[in-house]
A protein has these predicted regions:
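Hydrophobic, well-structured mid-protein blocks that either form specific transmembrane helices
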Residues: 91-100, 105-112
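Short, well-ordered beta-strand segments enriched in hydrophobic/aromatic residues
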Residues: 20-23, 27-29, 96, 129-132, ...
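Envelope-exposed proteins and targeting segments
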Residues: 17-19, 25-27, 37-39, 64, ...
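Solvent-exposed, conformationally flexible loop/turn segments
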Residues: 16, 61, 77-80
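Extended Gly/Ser/Thr-rich low-complexity repeat segments
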Residues: 31-34, 75-91, 189-192
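Membrane-interface segments at or immediately adjacent to transmembrane helices
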Residues: 2-40
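Short loop/beta submotifs within extracellular cysteine-rich repeat domains
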Residues: 28-30, 101, 186-188
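Short, surface-exposed interaction patches in beta-rich subdomains
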Residues: 8, 12, 35-36, 43-44, ...
Length: 192
């Protein structure tokens, strides 16, 4: 009989270090934040083609890497994906490839990050990030009180300003987030 933990966490990540979260798999990731430090991970308990997650952490270097990967499991133990929650008291660099995912970036401190794949992204008002690179097919919801600059080809609401530097959602305010769209991507922005 095989037994794998469907939930694990590390709440002891130091706020003295930045962390690089690396995920690369053909499954769904639901990413959210929580008040505190560290991370939690659990399975999306529905049929799928994804193995249970495990995390490998480096203890040296800057940023310190946390790599999520699939455990090799029987096809009977495959799940729909993973729910991952990140502590809002750590600084994260995201490098994620996933499919049909929901990425909630509402209350996180991020260094420049990359998201690849497909799904929905929510940029929350408490997001702290300089730049985000998107590659793939995404629908991105932007709250009215977050000023962003979108560089590259993307579908944006009609009321956004198409300036020489890119598309601005709040042209009366200084943008605080730069989102770069990689060529060949299909990204739709909407106000939320």
């Amino acid at each position: 009989t095989y037994k794998y933990d469907s939930f694990f966490q590390n709440s002891e990540l130091s706020s003295d270090f930045n962390y690089s979260l690396l995920i690369d798999f053909d499954g769904k990731v639901n990413l959210n934040s929580f008040q505190g430090r560290g991370y939690t991970a659990e399975i999306i308990d529905e049929p799928g083609n994804v193995g249970y997650p495990e995390a490998i952490e480096t203890v040296l270097g800057e940023p310190r890497a946390i790599i999520f990967r699939e455990l090799e499991t029987s096809s009977l133990l495959k799940v729909g994906g993973w729910n991952i929650n990140l502590g809002n008291q750590n600084i994260w660099e995201l490098d994620i490839f996933s499919l049909d995912s929901f990425i909630n970036l509402s209350d996180l401190k991020l260094s420049p990050s990359k998201l690849s794949g497909t799904g929905e992204i929510f940029l929350g008002p408490n997001l702290e990030i300089e730049s985000l690179s998107l590659s793939g097919n995404y629908e991105v919801t932007v709250p009215n009180d977050l000023s962003i600059l979108v560089k590259g080809q993307a579908q944006v609401p009609d009321q956004w300003l198409n300036a020489s530097v890119g598309n601005l959602n709040n042209p009366d305010k200084t943008y605080t987030v730069v989102i770069e769209i990689i060529d060949g991507s299909q990204v739709i922005f909407k106000d939320g």
